[in-house]
């Protein structure tokens, strides 16, 4: 399998580029580039294990995607094999390449269009100075308003993460990160640049978060303290697993200014379904990861959890967001795709898939819902006895 294609083919420090096979672990790229003072910016929580090929398939982000972008913004080129066995080289190390941007199309296509066999990524110089701020709040809505306040000041942190009370307590007990367990929410805000820039930004950010209700602000400037703060965040998912036998991780995006309202609505859904929710997410770019806690051994809880998760994603669409940020669609979110896209848009997805993979060999049944499925959900209706786009597969 592709997991065995795990070689770093070249590190070019002069041009800040790495060429790797798809099975190379995300973190391994930064480890290999560290000797040159470089690193690869996208850093999903699973970076110790996830592969760069998987990152391309899902267009993964991570803590630092707010400032440095998603996978699509950091991949310069890919070599891809089509379902017909043809080899395509898309993108490259030049500033711009002519023709349509097929590289961007491949990023996030979930393996439905081609098989990536090689990836060229850009590397960045490590910033000269970094500070990580922990801001604690007595209300999660206040933390949400603080996020909008910081971005509204024109400040783009390297990373901006939020955790609610359940997540904070679980992570602190698991990782001993120094989180205040009495907080209803915390923000972790990373700032980077020159020493003078970081000091000036830290003062501005502290002022904004305090104006929005932060009762405790700690700033870590040494590497060990920063690592300890981030360890808690990156351990949050396994830590939350200690609170219940099972959890269901959602992944949706919303406009930042809707953050406080959406968190309040998620709290209302949690009460309605009597299912606890731990919120751990990339607050800076509005990428939510509500973790619904449940016990699959209790009759009806799994079904209730899936229904509640679907309603959270539909809420994201309702406020102008999307049903996925970085975890993809697969089969899990096919129903919600019918909510976000209409039949005309789905038609274009089908035609694109058919152009790349006419026999439907690559990851079939994923990513794009059939029109019949959407019809059953009420997302598409028969008009005067005729179905739209009759040339497309109904199943």
Region locations from a protein language model:
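Conserved, mostly hydrophobic/aromatic
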Residues: 111, 290, 357
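Small/polar glycine-rich anion-binding or flexible loop at a beta-alpha turn
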Residues: 166, 283-286, 328-335, 369-370
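Short acidic/histidine-rich active-site segments
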Residues: 281, 322-329, 364-367
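C-terminal structured "cap/appendage" subdomains that terminate the fold
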Residues: 309-352
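C-terminal substrate-recognition/cap domain of FAD-linked oxidoreductases
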Residues: 121-125, 131-308, 315, 319
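Intrinsic disorder at enzyme termini
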Residues: 344-395
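Short beta-alpha connecting loops at secondary-structure transitions
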Residues: 13-16, 133, 297, 331-338
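FAD-binding subdomain of flavoenzyme oxidoreductases
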Residues: 6-161, 379-395
């Amino acid at each position: 399998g592709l997991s065995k294609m795990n070689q770093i083919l070249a590190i070019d420090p002069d041009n800040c580029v790495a060429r790797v096979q798809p099975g190379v672990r995300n973190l391994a790229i930064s480890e290999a580039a560290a000797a040159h003072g470089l690193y690869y910016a996208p850093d999903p929580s699973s970076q110790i294990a996830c592969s760069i090929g998987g990152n391309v398939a899902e267009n993964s982000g991570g803590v630092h995607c707010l400032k440095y972008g998603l996978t699509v913004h950091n991949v310069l080129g890919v070599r891809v094999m089509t379902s017909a066995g043809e080899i395509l080289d898309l993108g490259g190390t030049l500033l711009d390449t002519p023709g349509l941007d097929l590289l961007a199309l491949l990023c996030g296509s979930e393996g439905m269009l081609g098989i990536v066999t090689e990836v060229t990524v850009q590397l960045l110089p490590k910033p000269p100075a970094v500070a990580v701020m922990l801001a604690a709040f007595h209300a999660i809505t206040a933390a949400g308003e603080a996020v909008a306040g910081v971005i509204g000041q024109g400040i783009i942190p390297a990373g901006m993460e939020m955790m609610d009370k359940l997540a904070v307590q679980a992570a602190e007990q698991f990782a001993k990160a120094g989180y205040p367990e009495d907080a209803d929410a915390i923000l972790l805000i990373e700032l980077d640049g020159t020493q003078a820039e970081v000091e000036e930004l830290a003062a501005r950010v502290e002022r904004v978060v305090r104006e929005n209700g932060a009762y405790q602000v700690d700033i870590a400037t040494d590497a060990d303290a920063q690592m300890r703060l981030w360890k808690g965040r990156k351990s949050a998912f396994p830590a939350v697993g200690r609170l219940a036998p099972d959890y269901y991780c959602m992944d949706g995006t919303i406009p930042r200014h809707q953050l406080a309202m959406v968190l309040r609505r998620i709290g209302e859904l949690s009460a309605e379904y009597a299912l606890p929710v731990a919120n751990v997410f990339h607050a800076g770019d509005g990428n939510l990861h509500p973790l619904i806690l449940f016990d699959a051994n209790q009759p009806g809880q799994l079904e209730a959890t899936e229904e509640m998760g679907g309603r959270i994603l539909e809420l994201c669409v309702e406020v102008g967001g999307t049903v996925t940020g970085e975890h993809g669609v697969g089969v899990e979110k096919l129903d919600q795709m019918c909510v976000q896209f209409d039949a005309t848009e789905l038609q274009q997805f089908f035609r694109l898939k058919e152009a790349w993979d006419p026999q439907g060999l690559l990851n079939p049944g994923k990513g794009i819902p059939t029109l019949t499925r959407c019809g059953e959900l009420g997302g598409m209706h028969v008009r005067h006895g005729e179905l739209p786009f009759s040339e497309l597969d109904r199943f």
